[in-house]
């Protein structure tokens, strides 16, 4: 396909975020030309591919950091919000499968129970209170709870073997949780849009983004030939993971002023021993250690990748100044500006607990990592587990006023120019799980004058569009049943 010099839409990054928007725009505006620019030679290789992330369909079914205890009560507002956004994803994927835009859904989504795990009386009391707070909510149907040692051993044999049950345990669970291969989903997205004429430029790195009247001129370098080229776009979306911050800075929009990025590297322990893999059929999330950040929540997961099952435990965090797994050690330093130095310094002073946690994680050797695993799997053996490096997670540093100046945000942040001609998604979890919801926000912020015209198509793709599913149990149940069938989860 010949390179276009001018396009309606340029998307930077060929991971699950940009490709979600590409597919969405092709449904809404099939006549718009698009180009996707990717510095690597394959899609999703930085963060979307399966061992770069946990593959959890984040819907707050089991992730305890979404249900904090505040003044003795469980606050479920974050859990409800994340769940609603994941239902948008399920509806969008179901529509695309029904329209044959996507292929076999079992290539990217599979049923795996989601389990919350508590150990010690304080955690057990918390988990029981969480269960009571969620069990009657329409978005959390069929939630189950048990503090029986026998039920624990029956459901989680790998975690029960060798465990001292004098220390009380409890679990709550949903049988209808999911494991998602976002790399496979990304490739299905790309197959769909390239068949509709979208150009994908692999091995091309964006060197600059400049205003060109009402448009944007993007300068790219072919990393194989060294050749540079330019493409002009009416609208630019930056879905480039950790590089969203530097690229928005290159664009020079005032909205990015003061923002920074705090890179955290992730690692997993992976097990592919069939004998062990068959004894664990769940994603089991525990509680983060006191003082540890939300991203440190440990979990022992079943993964389903290319039809094969494996186990994952982690995450183990580390620190590097790189903004990408395959980035530069200068990334962080190049992002420093006079305008964001107060934000960085403010976070540095406030987040001493995070600094301590990262130092401890960096110093862990394999023996220490396996010792952490044994809190979940008491009889774990080091020889059954290998260390795998995950994608970089660049947490958002948001500018705030004195006296703190900067705030570390454990989530995602959408930054867009005032005229809506350029936008970028920064941050990490829940990221890929809620990509369709995040891209709807891009459309609403950047194409507000078209939303009314697009509304019928948006409701066709996402029937709950414009509705709070938490306020409409009938619509939730209807769309849940539909997506269960469409995505082959029953």
Swiss-Prot record:
Protein family according to the UniProt entry: Belongs to the MQO family.
Pathway where it operates: Carbohydrate metabolism; tricarboxylic acid cycle; oxaloacetate from (S)-malate (quinone route): step 1/1
Keyword match Glycosyltransferase: no
NCBIfam families with a match to the protein in the record: mal_quin_oxido (TIGR01320), PRK05257.2-1 (NF003606), PRK05257.3-2 (NF003611), PRK13339.1 (NF009875)
HAMAP family with a match to the protein in the record: MQO
Cofactor(s), by name: FAD
One Pfam short name: Mqo
Keyword ATP-binding: no
Top-level taxon of the source organism: Bacteria
Keywords for the protein's UniProt record, in alphabetical order: FAD, Flavoprotein, Oxidoreductase, Tricarboxylic acid cycle
InterPro entries: FAD/NAD-bd_sf (IPR036188), MQO (IPR006231)
GO molecular function list: 2-hydroxyglutarate dehydrogenase activity; L-malate dehydrogenase (quinone) activity
Gene Ontology biological process terms in this record: tricarboxylic acid cycle
EC number(s) per entry: 1.1.5.4
Record's protein name: Probable malate:quinone oxidoreductase
Catalytic activity from the UniProt record: (S)-malate + a quinone = a quinol + oxaloacetate
